[in-house]
Amino acid sequence: MLPRRRVITPTYTTMSQFESQPLIGLTLEGLRKVAAECGMPPFSAKQMAQWLYVKRITEIDAMTDLSKRARAKLAEHGFTVGRQQPLTAAESSDGTVKYLFEGVGGRDIESVYIPDRDRATLCVSSQAGCRMNCSFCMTGRQGFHGSLTAAGIMNQILSVPGSESLTNLVFMGMGEPLDNLPPVLEAIEIITSKWGMAWSPKRITVSTIGKLRELRTLLDTTKVHIAISIHSPYPTERLALMPVEKAFPIKDVISLLRQYDFSHQRRLSFEYIMFKGLNDDRRHCLELAHMLKGLDCRVNLIR
């Protein structure tokens, strides 16, 4: 099934409502509105997109093919590039690096750089905290403090050291991506559009508990890979691990996924944390195989 095109309304607001606004995180349509507000020609939107997402500048004055007057107007209207460097970085012995960025609600958010032979993956956050309350998740225990804007998501991608060498992106950091879908879709549009970073959607994976309406929207409007948190094939057991089983039963999630084709470019995977003595025996294995029978997918077992 080919994805249906969907017009994303950018989270852009005029300066009469807010004191300042970052340019990163704005789609081409959002940048066109910026250009119109500042009296710039419409083609300036693509120029700004190139500076922001390809050349990755950090200051408006670096946009040298915009006139001095246009750059002054951007600053006058309170626009900034909006890039913020990581607050801290902590490297593990395996080369993994955890970066902390300023988040929302007074809480920092994490991004994790994961090197692996010829790949360089960045795991990004979509929220500060999480509302899903999974019993095994440290983020859930911190409570929910707010959702990131598209600017907050894009800043992670653009501002980690060596960001130009990234090969893959996974939405598997703090938060539930489908609980903050509009900014996530805006970020994906920026990353995969020709006017933006021009990545193939095959380089992006979104991990989710499976909010049904939002999952359908993601499937219909993008071609990114999907990873579903499952952790048990038994509803009662999964409910104890993941309270969202009550609102979004895994059987309904799988029923929705069966309506889509994962046999070609798009990949479907299921994330399964193995808890010793709880969900790691032969009975669980057979039931999981039965549940997923006929789906073109893989299961990632996590210890």
Positions of predicted regions on the chain:
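Canonical Radical SAM [4Fe-4S] cluster-binding loop centered on the CxxxCxxC motif
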Residues: 115-152
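Flexible, acidic/Gly-rich N-terminal and inter-domain linker regions that tether
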Residues: 8-120
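Ferredoxin-type iron-sulfur electron-transfer modules in oxidoreductases and energy-metabolism complexes
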Residues: 151, 155-163
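Basic polycationic patches enriched in arginine
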Residues: 4-6
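Conserved AdoMet/S-adenosylmethionine-binding subsite of the radical SAM
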Residues: 161-168, 173-303
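Short, structured patches in soluble enzyme cores that scaffold and shape functional sites
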Residues: 113, 124-128, 138, 157, ...
